[in-house]
Amino acid sequence: MVAVDAVLVGTAAWIALRPTEELLAVLLTPGAFAWLVLVNVAVLGYRAWATWDAWERGSGTTGTIWLVVLLAFVTAPHAGAAALHLRVVVAVERVFAAPSVTSTTTTPVTTTSLSEPTAQQPTATTTIPATTTATTSEGELPWGEHLVLLLLGGDGGPDRDGVRTDAMLVVAVRSEDAAISVFSLPRNLRGFPFPNGQGFDDILNAVYRFGEEHPERFTGDDPGASALEGVVEAIIGERVDHHVLVDFEAFRAGVDALGGVTLPVPLTVTYPGFRLADGSRVDMVVEEGVRDLDGDMALAYVRSREEGTDYGRMERQKCVLAALLDQAEPAQALLALPSLLGAFEETVSTDIPRDVLPDIVTLLADVDLDRVGLITLGPPAWHAGWIAGGWPIPDVPRIQEAVAAALDGAPPLDAGLIPATTSCGL
């Protein structure tokens, strides 16, 4: 028994000394649940036997009722741990895609521009390999030298006709040093290349709905996301590895689960009639200065259109994302994981495979705010002209040059980006 106790204590000490992000990655690893259940049952069996043995040795002075009480106390934490992990497993299976299928073939997607601008558009044709998961050797990251995520903020709901992706950010992470480049795409871009010459002549935030309305033209389980991925790939010149569509309710719940976010607010932002999580409405005010924002305040801050322009709102969105990346502690994320995933089950859609999650968690754990660059790809610096009616046309060649430079390891300023520490005062 002493030997078993020593093994248990040693194992517990080893686990306690592991980095939290490593434990979080293990918890999210497919197949880990079965092993943890076996370990949990084995430890429970040993503790129950030790309890019974101690009771039997002293049975002359204690009654059976005390054995039942002791066994209940012994069993409770194990049952709680099993229930908690089961909840995580079920939520992960509902939110994230099935494990990836390895493949080495790609199908090129050619894009062309269809709109008629008042200024000349970029004439280059862009060919991007279709998204696949390449076979990797042991120890190699599934996405290779860099991970490109398309983060979408949607405002679909019972009072909306379809999903409008009013927040669109390309987050590119270098595998070598976890340097992050965030490219924010204005929702009013027009005259951009479109996959396979499909008939489309609207602004960028209408692409997702177009894909939903024409599922036969696009691949995958989410034709809206597939359509938007194709457009974004043509604009940035890089393959999008995965997308994440976050309903704004999920954003609110996520900020709360992580304990809020702290950031400098350069100008007071108001949101009259803001709807709180409980459905009531208030006139929300986020005052100038360094502020601790909960989920409601953060959502009002990134969605308000009362002050400034759409581009100012995009700046706020990027800064909140950078602050969350910088401040989200792995330990807090581990504790908040059940509530996070519970909130995401019905409000997040993604094609990230479950077996890739541990690698992403490990990569993002190394984020350093000094290596985070931000830019809004809007006029005047990043546009090539205007569509009649005042719609900006993206300067595709320049955008692709900036994205390539960032992924090649150029400092943010050299790639045309602004360091988050400068842009957001973090």
Give the positions of each predicted feature.
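Non-catalytic, solvent-exposed segments at the cell envelope interface
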Residues: L28, L84-L426
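Structural motif marking the loop-to-transmembrane transition
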Residues: A3, G31-W35, T62-W66, A333, ...
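Internal/C-terminal transmembrane anchor helices
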Residues: G60-V90
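Hydrophobic residues in alpha-helical membrane-spanning segments
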Residues: T20, A76-H78, D395
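Short intrinsically disordered, low-complexity coil segments enriched in acidic
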Residues: V2-L17, E176, I399-V403, D414
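Generic hydrophobic/packing signal
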Residues: W52, E56-S59, Y208, I236
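Membrane-embedded alpha-helical segments of integral membrane proteins
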Residues: A3-R57
